Amino acid sequence: TQIYKTYLKYVSPADIYPYSIDEVFIDVTGYLPYYHMSAHELAMTMVREVLYNTGITATAGIGTNLYLAKLAMDIVAKHIPADKDGVRIAELDEQSYRYLLWSHRPLTDFWMTGPGTVKKLEAHGIYTMGDLARFSIHGEDRLYEILGVDAEILIDHAWGYEPCGMEQIKNYKPSTNSISEGQVLTCPYPNDKAKLIVREMAEILMFRLTEKKLVTESITLEIGYDRENVDK
């Protein structure tokens, strides 16, 4: 897509991971000395070029790891004022994460923390990431009893750590020989807009196939409908 091509003017495909139809992770660590820019300056440069080329206003989250970058965009950026063009760029490191988000609620706002997990945590008096971090100091074994293997990543996230980087994501090999792309829409879409979404998802899959040097003979499309709007 045009937005993806804009990113490629600044970074290599090896340092970009399309996370969803409208979101990517970009590791700019090695590019900052080359461009003589801070992470904020480089993000702003790319965001403004996207705006100029497409008319689309992007939001960016900057973090010292993937998890913090995701939260900077998902949570922090939503609560800061936009500039004159509607652009929001937020930043987090481990210390600012603990200061700004350890008391944030609900826990479902945090990446990879679903309602089922939150329900289990709240049953044990854990309502915030700060609660979870403090509980883990002396109750790590108990968290594994409550959450199973998921406790490891949640404890890391509670402290603002993320052991997985771009290289690990790129080298991950799933047990099944397939790739997929999903999108949950926030409201009902008419046919013409839905077709555009499907086309954009197909383009993302095309980029991923090309990057992995793969070909396919089969494509499956699944569409779900919410009952309320189907009945209309």
Feature annotation, model-predicted:
Residues 109, 119-232:
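DNA-contacting surface of Y-family translesion DNA polymerases
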